[in-house]
C-alpha cells in the first residue's frame, strides 16, 4: 500500500499532501480527499489478505478523519494549535477578555428574551450579529495562525469561536420553535 509510509507519523496536512495552514482552499482539500480515498478505499482491496483489508480500512478511516478536521474551520484551527503544543480545550485555561464575556452575556439575554417572546425578528438579528462576529474572529484566527504564528493567542480566539458556534446552534434551535 503506497500510502502506508504517510500514515504512521504524519499530521493531517501531510497526509492530505497540503500545506500546514489555516487558509485552505476547500476545492483543493476535497480533491486531495477524493484522490486519497480512491487509493485507500477498502473496496479496492477486497481481494487482498485480511491484513491488507484491515490496513486499507485503517487508512480510509484516517483519511476521513483528516478530511473532517481540515474542512471545519474551528476544528482546523484547534488542530493547528495542538500541533504547536497548545491545548485549546484545556480546562485550566478558560480566561477570556472582559469585553467578550460582556458580549456573551448580552447575546445570551437577547436569545432568552427572543425565545421567551417567540420573536423571529430578534432571533434573525441576533443570528446576523453572531455570524458577523464569527467571520471577524475567523479572520483574526487566520492572521494569528498563518501570518503571526501565534498559537497561544490563536487558541484564545478558538475558545471564543467555540462559544460563537454554540450560541449559533442555540439560535438555530430557537428559530425552529
What annotation goes with each model-predicted range?
Residues 1-177:
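C-terminal accessory/regulatory regions appended to core domains
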Amino acid at each position: 500500500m503506497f500510502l502506508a509510509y504517510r500514515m504512521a507519523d504524519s499530521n493531517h496536512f501531510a497526509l492530505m499532501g497540503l500545506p500546514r495552514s489555516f487558509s485552505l482552499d476547500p476545492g483543493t482539500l476535497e480533491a486531495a480527499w477524493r484522490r486519497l480515498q480512491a487509493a485507500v478505499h477498502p473496496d479496492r482491496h477486497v481481494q487482498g489478505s485480511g491484513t491488507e483489508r484491515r490496513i486499507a480500512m485503517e487508512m480510509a478511516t484516517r483519511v476521513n478523519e483528516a478530511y473532517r478536521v481540515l474542512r471545519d474551520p474551528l476544528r482546523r484551527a484547534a488542530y493547528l494549535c495542538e500541533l504547536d503544543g497548545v491545548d485549546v480545550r484545556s480546562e485550566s485555561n478558560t480566561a477570556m477578555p472582559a469585553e467578550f464575556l460582556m458580549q456573551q452575556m448580552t447575546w445570551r439575554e437577547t436569545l432568552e428574551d427572543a425565545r421567551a417572546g417567540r420573536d423571529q425578528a430578534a432571533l434573525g438579528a441576533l443570528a446576523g450579529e453572531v455570524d458577523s462576529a464569527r467571520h471577524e474572529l475567523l479572520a483574526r484566527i487566520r492572521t494569528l495562525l498563518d501570518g503571526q504564528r501565534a498559537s497561544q493567542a490563536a487558541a484564545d480566539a478558538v475558545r471564543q469561536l467555540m462559544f460563537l458556534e454554540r450560541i449559533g446552534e442555540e439560535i438555530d434551535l430557537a428559530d425552529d420553535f
